[in-house]
């Protein structure tokens, strides 16, 4: 048994090429579905009813220490960008040994915002490029955990298509 404890290391790649000069951390996007409030006769109060397969806007901010060629390449708003985040999850075995498990996040999206940052002597610029996500895949140890393709209408959890029954009806 492996008890996961932290991300030991990660790297970000654009079209297979490592991006240099990134910032320290990246927050992965939330999977939040739009809801409707349900209330009325026979219902005690109200509740939020999610719409499976539909998701609110998802963003991924890619931080850089300074404005660079790599950062500027992501500022192109006419072309979807393909990023791959590869890392290692550190964990402890039953015997107390440390083991690493691969994690991979694949993202495709269009540039939504470019923040060149600030200029201050002896400091980083805190440059950031924000992508509007069209596709995301999160894998751990080669197994897909979550996959969402907003354009092609696919949403899978653990490799199981969550919308298969709905697709069969349409």
What does each model-found stretch correspond to?
Residues 110-170:
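Mixed-charge, glycine-accented linear interaction segment located at domain edges/termini
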Residues 1-69, 108-119, 160-168:
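Solvent-exposed edge beta-strands and adjacent loop segments
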Residues 74-105:
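Short, acidic/charged, Gly/Pro-enriched secondary-structure junctions
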């Amino acid at each position: 048994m492996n008890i996961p404890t932290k991300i030991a290391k990660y790297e970000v790649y654009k079209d297979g090429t490592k991006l240099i000069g990134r910032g320290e951390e990246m927050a992965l996007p939330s999977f939040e579905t739009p809801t409707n409030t349900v209330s009325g006769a026979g219902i005690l109060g109200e509740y939020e009813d999610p719409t499976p397969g539909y998701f609110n806007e998802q963003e991924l901010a890619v931080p850089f220490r300074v404005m660079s060629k790599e950062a500027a390449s992501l500022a192109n708003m006419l072309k979807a960008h393909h990023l791959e985040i590869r890392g290692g999850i550190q964990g402890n075995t039953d015997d107390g040994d440390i083991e690493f498990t691969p994690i991979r996040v694949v993202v495709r999206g269009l540039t939504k915002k470019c923040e060149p940052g600030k200029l201050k002597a002896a400091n980083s610029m805190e440059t950031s490029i924000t992508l509007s996500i069209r596709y995301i895949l999160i894998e751990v140890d080669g197994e897909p955990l979550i996959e969402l393709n907003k354009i092609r209408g696919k949403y899978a959890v653990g490799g199981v298509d969550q919308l298969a029954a709905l697709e069969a009806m349409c």
